[in-house]
């Protein structure tokens, strides 16, 4: 029984470690992807909007 308990515990610890590593990798990948996508989308939208506004103001002034 002692040996069985030990192996078990070992398999459980291995499963937990693998699960934790996978979850961490997934969360990191999701965060990185989300940040990159959000940043690129926001940057493009903001840049385009600011450029249009700036060009309109310049054209009106000139």
Swiss-Prot record:
- Tissue and organ distribution: Testis.
Where is region (Disordered) located? Answer: 1-62
Q: Which PROSITE patterns match?
A: PROTAMINE_P1
Full protein name: Sperm protamine P1
Q: Where are its TM segments located?
A: none
Function field: Protamines substitute for histones in the chromatin of sperm during the haploid phase of spermatogenesis. They compact sperm DNA into a highly condensed, stable and inactive complex.
Give the subcellular location: Nucleus; Chromosome
Source organism of the structure: Petrogale xanthopus
Q: Give one GO term, molecular function aspect.
A: DNA binding
